[in-house]
Every structure is written in structure tokens, then in C-alpha cells.
């Protein structure tokens, strides 16, 4: 049986606010606004199909990209899905239903951060909540980029302070789920390799 964390209704408004700096705009113009801020991150991670597409179109190759071939709950265009299948990436697939973070997703992310390969994680379901464990698991100095629907791209520099902010949010999610099996997820997110 899969262990998972479900996003409760009362915490959904928290997930609508940007977790970092919001760069407003659309397309490649938005990428141009923050490209100077990238400054050789430890790892560059993109979450979302449209964000990944515009990075690749601008010649910026994330170390890890997390996609589900959907945007705003609708299929992405063929151009976007084709571009996101860039040949530089090795692909890994994972099941992760909408509104949930599964232990399978977290284990896949753990393996991705341990790898030196460029990875495309294809999520069967929804990748939106992956941003939380990504920030917690990414090495310090990494940059996480994800789309804020109809607004732009959110730029998150991974610092100890940012990890602590996300850890507090994660603890709220875990406490609302009331499942002793969630200790497995907590241990992985705290850096333990044994689930």
C-alpha cells in the first residue's frame, strides 16, 4: 500500500501563494527576467510543463524537470510535450494522483537528487505538489522554478531558511493526515536513505 500525504481543503489557500519570488509575465520573456539570478545553482529543478518548456526554449537545461503533460488540468500542446521530451534527459515515471504527495514520488525525487544524470520525471497524475518535497530535498544553493498559473514563474533559491519554511508547511500537512505510516515520508525528507 502506498503511503501518501493529501492536501486538505483548509490548507489549499497556502499552496496558492508563491513560495519564492514571482516573476510576472508569459513565455520566454519571463525567463529573461530571472536568467541573471540563476548564477550556477547547485541543481536547477523545474516543476511544470510550461515552465520546463520555456526554460528549454531559452537554452536553459534543468538538472531535473518534473512534468505531467498537463497545464491547468488540461493537456499541454503537442509542441510543449514534444519539447519537454528533450533527448538529454533520462526519463523516470511515477504515479502521483492530484492533490497528493506519494511516498513513490518522494523516493523517486531522492534517487533523482542522488543521480548525476539529467532526469525528466514524468508524473502520471499531477506534479503540482512536488514543489514542496523538491525544495526540502534539493541541495543548498539549488534553484527551483515552477509556474504560478496566469501570473508567471516562481523562483525559489534553496536556503536553510527556505527549507525550514517548507518543513513547517509540510508538518501542517502531515498533522492533518493522521497516519502513522507518514513517518516513512518524514524520515526520507529528513535525509534518511532507509524508508
Swiss-Prot record:
Name which cysteines form disulfide bonds: none
Q: Does the keyword Transferase apply?
A: yes
Tell me the pathway. Answer: Cofactor biosynthesis; coenzyme A biosynthesis
State the reactions this protein catalyses.
3'-dephospho-CoA + GTP = GDP + CoA + H(+)
State the Gene Ontology terms under molecular function: GTP binding; kinase activity
Q: Locate the residues binding GTP.
A: 49-50, 68, 127, 150
Q: Which Pfam families match?
A: DUF359
Q: Which domain of life is it from?
A: Archaea
Arranged from A to Z, the UniProt key words for this protein are: Coenzyme A biosynthesis, GTP-binding, Kinase, Nucleotide-binding, Transferase
Matching entries from InterPro entries are given as:
GTP-dep_dephospho-CoA_kin
Q: What is its EC number?
A: 2.7.1.237
Report whether Transferase shows up as a keyword of the record.
Answer: yes
For this chain's UniProt record, which GO biological process terms are given? coenzyme A biosynthetic process
Q: Where is the signal peptide?
A: none
What HAMAP family does the record point to?
Answer: Dephospho_CoA_kinase_GTP_dep (MF_00590)
Q: Family assignment?
A: Belongs to the GTP-dependent DPCK family.
What function is annotated for this protein?
Answer: Catalyzes the GTP-dependent phosphorylation of the 3'-hydroxyl group of dephosphocoenzyme A to form coenzyme A (CoA).
Name of the protein in question? GTP-dependent dephospho-CoA kinase
Q: Which organism is it from?
A: Methanosarcina acetivorans (strain ATCC 35395 / DSM 2834 / JCM 12185 / C2A)
Amino acid at each position: 500500500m502506498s503511503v501518501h500525504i493529501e492536501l486538505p481543503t483548509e490548507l489549499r489557500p497556502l499552496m496558492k501563494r508563491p513560495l519564492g519570488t514571482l516573476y510576472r509575465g508569459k513565455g520566454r520573456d519571463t525567463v529573461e527576467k530571472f536568467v541573471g539570478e540563476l548564477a550556477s545553482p547547485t541543481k536547477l529543478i523545474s516543476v511544470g510543463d510550461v515552465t520546463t518548456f520555456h526554460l528549454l526554449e531559452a537554452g536553459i537545461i534543468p538538472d531535473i524537470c518534473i512534468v505531467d503533460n498537463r497545464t491547468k488540468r488540461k493537456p499541454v500542446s503537442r509542441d510543449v510535450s514534444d519539447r519537454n521530451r528533450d533527448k538529454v534527459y533520462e526519463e523516470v515515471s511515477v504515479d502521483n494522483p492530484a492533490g497528493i504527495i506519494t511516498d513513490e514520488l518522494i523516493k523517486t525525487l531522492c534517487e533523482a537528487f542522488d543521480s548525476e544524470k539529467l532526469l525528466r520525471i514524468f508524473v502520471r497524475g499531477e506534479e503540482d505538489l512536488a514543489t514542496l518535497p523538491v525544495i526540502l530535498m534539493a541541495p543548498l544553493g539549488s534553484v527551483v522554478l515552477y509556474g504560478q498559473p496566469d501570473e508567471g514563474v516562481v523562483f525559489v533559491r534553496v536556503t536553510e531558511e527556505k527549507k525550514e519554511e517548507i518543513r513547517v508547511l509540510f508538518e501542517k500537512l502531515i498533522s492533518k493526515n493522521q497516519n502513522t505510516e507518514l513517518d516513512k515520508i518524514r524520515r526520507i525528507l529528513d535525509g534518511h536513505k532507509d524508508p
